Curated annotation (Swiss-Prot):
Endpoints of the signal sequence: none
Family per record: Belongs to the RuBisCO small chain family.
Keywords associated with the record: Calvin cycle, Carbon dioxide fixation, Photosynthesis
Protein name: Ribulose bisphosphate carboxylase small subunit
Expression induction or repression: Expression of this form I ribulose-bisphosphate carboxylase operon predominates when carbon dioxide is limiting.
Gene Ontology process terms (BP): reductive pentose-phosphate cycle
Family annotation (CDD domains): RuBisCO_small (cd03527)
Subunit structure: Heterohexadecamer of 8 large and 8 small subunits.
Annotated Gene3D superfamilies: Ribulose bisphosphate carboxylase, small subunit
Alphabetical list of SUPFAM superfamilies matching this protein: RuBisCO, small subunit
Pfam families: RuBisCO_small
Job description of the protein: RuBisCO catalyzes two reactions: the carboxylation of D-ribulose 1,5-bisphosphate, the primary event in carbon dioxide fixation, as well as the oxidative fragmentation of the pentose substrate. Both reactions occur simultaneously and in competition at the same active site. Although the small subunit is not catalytic it is essential for maximal activity.
Species classification: Bacteria, Pseudomonadati, Pseudomonadota, Alphaproteobacteria, Rhodobacterales
Length: 129
């Protein structure tokens, strides 16, 4: 099952040229760019592992692409995403996030419904590999 999280998730995978163009768009607006990776794509897993430090002073997308290549080499079977942060108001806000690397075989999410007290429904999600 294809995981759909972030911008462009319903489109085919972006090429490196398209990724570079999106990073250039982010940098042109003064947003800081960072890379994160995970092997657990569960929607509630919002805290992925950071790859390096956020690139606050970067002006050229080549720096991000070099870091992305290194991250892909280190974690070829993981999800990798690019985040862009806007800190113009004194606090960091994610303005853009998109997946740039996926494992060859993506896991599926299974949802189980359980009726509990008072006819309430409890939902449990698990990953099926």
């Amino acid at each position: 099952m294809r995981i759909t999280q972030g911008c462009f998730s319903f489109l085919p995978d972006l090429t490196d040229e398209q990724i570079s163009a999106q990073v250039d768009y982010c940098l042109g607006r003064g947003w800081a760019v960072s890379l994160e990776h995970t092997d657990d794509p569960h929607p509630r897993n919002t805290y992925w592992e950071m790859w390096g430090m956020p690139m606050f002073d970067l002006r050229d997308p080549k720096g991000v692409m070099i870091e992305l290549d290194e991250c892909r080499k280190a974690w070829p079977g993981r999800y990798i995403r690019i985040n862009a942060f806007d800190s113009t108001r004194g606090f960091e806000t994610v303005t853009m996030s998109f997946i740039v690397n996926r494992p060859e075989v993506e896991p599926s999410l299974r949802m189980e419904r359980t009726e509990v007290d008072g006819r309430s429904i409890r939902y449990t999600h698990s990953i099926v590999r």
